[in-house]
Amino acid sequence: MNPTEIFNLLVTFKGHKTSSAGEELLGIEEIELTLQDEKNIFDIKETEFQNVVLIESGSDPLVVAKELADASTTVISKIVPIELVIRTRPDLIAEKVITISKDKIKSGETFVVRGDIRGREYIKSKEKFLSSISQEITEKLGVEMEKNSPDWVIQIEVVGENTGLSVLKPENIIKKF
């Protein structure tokens, strides 16, 4: 994967992270079948991480995520629309999260920071990292963190040297089981 890969959706599949069973191939096929109509121009990119693919879509990622959520699929597990892709550097991630959060999260609203770290050479401790981002947002934007029912979810998806960032309403991060 190249630094600063272009993508606006991250999709994970059910299955073991170390398994090379057919979940990833089946998942890619499910995405292709769901998005095959002429209005969707997209590119599915495999990653070095098992059961994780990136999608670059010419359509609104929120709309594409909903299409995938509504489709009858068997292995798609999580669908995350991505607003911004940057290189994986903790200081840059914090800076960009603040930038995109301040335009969305208003005074009196709440947030939670969630994410997955794939590739530990960039960020050693997921818990420490997400906690430090939460603290920085609270201090710089003057908004409260709420884990259980936040108004906004700040989603940080580290995929090796690339990180996808989003500030989304909770219902826009789709988990299928």
Task: Name the predicted role of every residue range.
Residues 1-177:
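SAM-dependent transferase fold signal centered on methyltransferase-like domains
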